[in-house]
């Protein structure tokens, strides 16, 4: 009897897992590859490329396992256009992080149609950190990870229409735009 009960529990859990995989949003993300950012504190500075730091933060979060980097041959429910901006206030030792997000979904044959942008949002965080060129990469990754955690809860509340498959050809257009 307990063996049958255990089998039913395993079946129930696997059904939940499979339904979650089937109904989960398939998303792509885009971060402008060409931009570099610098953080400064008095005589020290730290330069980094937001796209590679964002890639690292996304890879470390299991909740983003169904989110792919934007590519022409990918088809998804929507594209997240991420623009992270960090600044450091040396006097108060605060690292400020903003994540500007646009959610794009093909709802018109014209790629640049404003109706294709279904949501725009801004997420902000801050951390008290001591500026150090050696550990600044860790703090940047930490604030990116925290921003992405806040973003996933906002995306879960957003109803993305699965009737508008979005291919990654828009990613090619985004790479040509200088922000």
Where are these regions (language model features)?
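C-terminal/domain-edge helix-coil "capping" segments
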Residues: 108-179
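Short, solvent-exposed, polar/charged sequence segments at loop or secondary-structure edges
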Residues: 45-92
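Surface-exposed short loop/turn segments
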Residues: 72-131
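A structural "domain/chain start" motif
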Residues: 4, 9, 13-16, 20-65, ...
């Amino acid at each position: 009897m307990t063996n049958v009960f255990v089998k039913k529990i395993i079946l129930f859990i696997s059904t939940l897992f499979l339904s979650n995989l089937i109904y989960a949003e398939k998303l792509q993300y885009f971060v402008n590859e060409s931009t570099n950012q610098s953080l400064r504190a008095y005589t020290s500075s730290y330069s980094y490329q937001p796209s590679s730091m964002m890639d690292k933060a996304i890879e470390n979060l299991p909740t983003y396992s169904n989110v792919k980097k934007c590519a022409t041959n990918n088809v998804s429910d929507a594209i997240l256009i991420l623009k992270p901006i960090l600044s450091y206030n040396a006097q108060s030792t605060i690292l400020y992080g903003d994540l500007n997000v646009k959610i794009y979904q093909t709802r018109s044959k014209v790629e640049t149609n404003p109706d294709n942008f279904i949501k725009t949002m801004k997420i902000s965080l801050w951390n008290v950190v001591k500026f150090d060129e050696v550990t600044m990469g860790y703090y940047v990754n930490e604030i990116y990870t925290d921003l992405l955690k806040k973003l996933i809860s906002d995306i879960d509340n957003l109803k993305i229409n699965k009737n508008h498959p979005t291919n990654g050809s828009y990613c090619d257009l985004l790479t040509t735009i200088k922000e």
